[in-house]
C-alpha cells in the first residue's frame, strides 16, 4: 500500500531534483533594476566550481530518534548520496544495509517513526556495501532493484592496471566528481508506474552507451561513420537508454539543435517508447502515424 509519507518524500525529491538540474530564477538588483537572475545551485558544467564533502557517521535529528548514516556525500552542502556499510561477517550483509537505508527513510512499513525523511528530500543515490561488494539504487527502490555498477567508464578496467572489487568499480564509475554530477543531471528520470512515481537511475551499460554515442556524434567528422549499433538484451532498458541520450544531447551546446527520430518495428514498442518519452522528459514529442506525417515533421525547423 502506498503511504502518504512515501508520496511526500517522492514529490519533494522530484521538485528538488528539477530545481538542481534546471536552475532557479531569483529577483535581484545588480544596478540595472530588479531582474530575474539565474542561480545555479550546482555547476554541472565545471565540477571543480562545486564543494564536495564526504562525512562519516553524520548524526541527523529525527522526529523520534537520531539516525547516523555511515557515509553522506554532500555537494554544496546538499546531502545527495547516502552509503551504508556493513560487516561482511554478519548474515546477509547486503540486505542488512538496504534494510538500514529503508529504516532511515521510514520505509520498513513500521508504525514507529524510526527515521528522518527530510534527509532523503535531496537524495540522488543510495548505496549498500560490505567489503568488496556494493549495490546502488534510488529512494523508490526495493531490495531487488539495488544493482551493481560494473564499469569504471570513461576508464577501462585495463586502464586502471589492477583487478578491482565491485565496490571499487562502483566508486570509480559513479563517484568521480564528473560522473556523479553527470548521473544526477542526465541519467535520472521519474516515471509513473501503477499509480506511483518511480525514480530511475541509469545502469552502467546505459551510461557507457550514451557517452560513446555522444563521443561519436561530436568527434567523428565523416557522416557515414557516425552511425553504430547499441546492442541490448530483452528487458535491459532500451527505451530509457534513448531517453538518456536525448536528454544529454539537449544539454550539449554542439548537439542540442539536432532533430531526433526514433523508428520502431512493432506497434507495441512504438506505444511503449512514446509513453516513456512523454512520461520522463519535457521536450516536445511528435508521434508520426504515417510516412506523410514523418516527412512534415522532418521539414520543421524546430529541434523536436
Give the role of each language-model region.
Residues 1-264, 268-284, 301-303:
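ATP-dependent helicase/translocase motor core
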Residues 267, 288-297:
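Conserved helicase motor
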